[in-house]
């Protein structure tokens, strides 16, 4: 399943929701967290989680714009679950995350 945490407003909890959902899903199977926000807060969080050796830690990548859809589709084939954290503005990246979600 592919989830997208999106909203056109910043500060509403998208990243918090995305990272907690990704960890919960990682306990159930192989999970990818796509950070599609230029602030890269989800990727920063994931790096901290790996450094502190908390388990499970979802695989994380940063993608932007149309790459969220194009590369996201290819990457998703290797995972049971995918969570996309999109930036808080109406953008190509946000719309690509919505198109990728199931």
Annotate the PLM regions.
Residues 1-101:
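P-loop NTP-binding core
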């Amino acid at each position: 399943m592919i989830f997208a945490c999106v909203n056109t407003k910043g500060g509403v909890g998208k990243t918090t929701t995305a990272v907690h959902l990704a960890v919960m899903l990682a306990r159930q199977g192989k999970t990818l967290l796509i950070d599609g926000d230029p602030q890269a807060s989800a990727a920063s969080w994931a790096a901290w989680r790996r450094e502190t050796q908390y388990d499970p830690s979802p695989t994380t990548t940063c993608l932007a714009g149309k790459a969220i859809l194009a590369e996201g589709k290819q990457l998703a084939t290797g995972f049971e679950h995918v969570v996309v954290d999109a930036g808080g503005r109406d953008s190509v990246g946000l719309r690509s995350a919505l198109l990728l979600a199931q």
